[in-house]
Each structure stands twice: as structure tokens, then as C-alpha cells.
């Protein structure tokens, strides 16, 4: 299968709005190339300074690269995306640029390897690409071996990083966990590394489920995690201590009540994928359903909310 890569340059003020527009139309992830990074002295997570190629970044603003299945991307979709972006109140049309490039799936997989290197995603978790070797810094470090393939969730995005930190804080070995929209499976693997014995990973995309299963094998936990296709929690009859969902805000809104019903008493809902402009609506709806808000974390325009199921 081939993929259509959209390369869209916009001003910083609309970066998060455009990201949400692209994802709402079905983009399988968004890569961000920010011109501001060229003004910094790049240092990786291990303190090593490296050089950036200015040709990889726009002269102004930010370049968003989005990827669509070649069978779903068409002129109508292109027109709708263009219309919504150009309708944004803060859009700077003087730097706006929209380019298309058809990429073969094998090229896509190699593209990820150029950007993906070992890094510490949280206090305990280090993400290690499956094609690279890595030596742990200490015995407390938990390494997640990952090959994102055609699914997303590498740990470097603020939403995934915040979820990993929340998992460190709220998930106990005695808990049961259901990971909704598992993607690469990273959050399920993290839960397993903390000692959780019962984990279920759901994703509506069967390709993502297959990628997650491969990553579970790489981390020697494929027998410990049930990975299945699923549409949110609509047909879920089991109860869990923890529900994790790192997905888009409008999808989170759809599943809040089902999440409450899926949790046992005092269970936690860890959710991210929420932009700043939407988090208060999500928080209000969670409270209305019956959640007590335990934690709200902000990172670079994104928000992670942790709610606890309480009665009365």
C-alpha cells in the first residue's frame, strides 16, 4: 500500500488547530518540523550535540507532514482540508504552502528510522528503536523496544510522554489495564513493565493492532497482553482498574461515559491527545459523568487529564 504525504507550512499560531484538522480527516500521524529549532543548539537526550540541516525545515513557521492511505485521499478530501485550514482566524496566508508526495510503504518505514533514536521518555521509561542497541543506565530504568511501523506512538510526542508519566504515578502491579487506541502498543508495554498482569489493548485500526502485537513480541509480553480490534469501549463488558486513552479530544468525549462504566470503583482514567482549547470541555464532561479530577498536566499545547471514578 502507498501513502500520500502532505507537507503543509503554516504559522506557529495555528499549529495545533491544523494538527487536529489533519487528524480529524484520518491522517495516520503528523510529523512536526519547526523552524524555531534552527535557532537553538540541538542537544539530544543523552547530552550529545548534533547538527541540523536547514533544508529539512521551513524558512518560517512550522511544516506539518501528514500521511493518508492512498485509497482514502482524493481531491474532495484535499479541498476540505484546504478550506478548513484557510478558514482559521489566525492563519497567515503569506507563508501557507500545501504539497503532496506519494510514498511507498517500504519508504515510509525507512523514513521513521531517520528520526527515531533511543531517548528517555519519562523518569523510568526509555524508548529504544528495535533496530538500535542500547545499554541501560541503571537497574531502575525500564526499556521499551519499539518499531512504530505504520502505527504511531513513539513516546516523543508530549501526549505519549505525559501518559507514560501518569502510568508511572497511578498504575500498580495489582491493577488491570485497558489501553484504548493502543497504536504502537507503547502504553500497554509500559504497564506490563510495571508488573501489571492483566492488560487489554484495543484499536479500531487492524494494522495498528498487528503493529502492537509485533512490539509486544519484541518486549516479550505478547502472551501477557490481549490485543484486539475494537471500537472504543462500546462493547466492553469487563471491568478494569485503569483505562488509558491517548486519542483525539472529540473521540475522548464520545467515550467518557463508557469509560466510567468500565472502571471499577476508585479506578483511574488516564487520557491525553487533548489540545489546550479543548481540555476544559473534557474536564467538565468528566466531572458531570462522575469523575473526580486528580491531575491535569500541560506540555507544549497538549493536556493530559487523570480522573478517578467516585460514587456520591
UniProtKB/Swiss-Prot annotation:
Entry-linked PANTHER family: ELECTRON TRANSFER FLAVOPROTEIN BETA SUBUNIT LYSINE METHYLTRANSFERASE
> Which GO molecular function entries does the Swiss-Prot or TrEMBL record give?
protein-lysine N-methyltransferase activity
Which reaction does this chain catalyze?
L-lysyl-[protein] + 3 S-adenosyl-L-methionine = N(6),N(6),N(6)-trimethyl-L-lysyl-[protein] + 3 S-adenosyl-L-homocysteine + 3 H(+)
Name where it mostly resides: cytoplasm
Q: Which gene encodes it?
A: prmA
Organism, scientific name: Staphylococcus epidermidis (strain ATCC 35984 / DSM 28319 / BCRC 17069 / CCUG 31568 / BM 3577 / RP62A)
The protein depicted here goes by the name: Ribosomal protein L11 methyltransferase
**Keywords in alphabetical order:** Cytoplasm, Methyltransferase, S-adenosyl-L-methionine, Transferase
Q: What class of enzyme is it?
A: transferase
Q: What is its EC number?
A: 2.1.1.-
